[in-house]
Amino acid sequence: MVYEMNEILFWNDIPNYLAFMRELETKLNPNKIVEDRRKWADEMASFILREIPTKQDFLDRIAEYERNGKPVSITSRNLSCGNLSLEQLKKADQNARFRGKERADIVEQAIANWAKDHVDFYVEHVLKQSQENIFEMTIGGGFGTASVVRSMKENDFYTGVDIDFKCVKNADGILKHYDKHGCGIATSLWNLPFDDETFSVVCSYMGLDECREVPTILKEAARVLKPNGRIVLVCGNTKYRRLKRCFDLYGFTEEETTECCRRIRLYVDHAQLSDEMHRLGFAEAAYYQSDTCYVVEYTKM
């Protein structure tokens, strides 16, 4: 069960969903990440099946979002600091300190083993110039953040955005760990708080396939990019890698899942992404594919 699918299923029932998420949030321990993720997934599955008991109920919610759904700034990850208790703020800060080193260690180990080639390609295309103004869409767990930040030069500056306050704190922890310049901002990708033509490069590591309304996000990314800038993205190879778990609750076939994702405007594959970028005036400048993901760079045509 993943945020982007939950935000579609419950977009018109936010208060009920937020109440559940806030209750669940108080139970999670940031120092028991694997254990808590399993518990979170199990409890989320139970909640979804309780609120949406049948496949037809699920399809009805898909149809409602297809007709009327739109990006909203208050979502299931409504963890901006104004909506957090003091205890949750303290917990988020502690988590940042813990996660900064943890994410750095994970990235260092991954680069030393299975992830070296595609991470090196990604970072090489993000950090091309002598003074980069970097904008990362979707900080998430911080793997892509740490991959870039560890290689930043003295005059580079990093800005990361995520709708989740906890993920923003991941970026803060990583920046502190590597002693690099930058900040994390909790805001929506659908309406970025930046002027036009602000950043020299926009990047995202396994972030787009966790987002909904991707065309809106890409349009905003293009708006804040300088005329000679680049957009560099890492995306998963496996179709519906994360989304499939939600559809599996109701026994959807792959064909049914594909059709639902098309109707609700979720990211699907490289060809679809490149078509959207072409509509925005971008051409593919570089491409690399590994067993688990692909990396693509786009530049203005």
What is the predicted function of each stretch?
Residues L280-M301:
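Core SAM-dependent methyltransferase catalytic element
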Residues P215-R230:
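A short glycine-rich, Lys/Arg-flanked "PGG" loop and its adjoining helix->strand segment in the class I
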Residues F135-N191:
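Class I SAM-dependent methyltransferase SAM/SAH-binding core
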Residues C203:
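A conserved beta-strand element that flanks and buttresses the S-adenosyl-L-methionine
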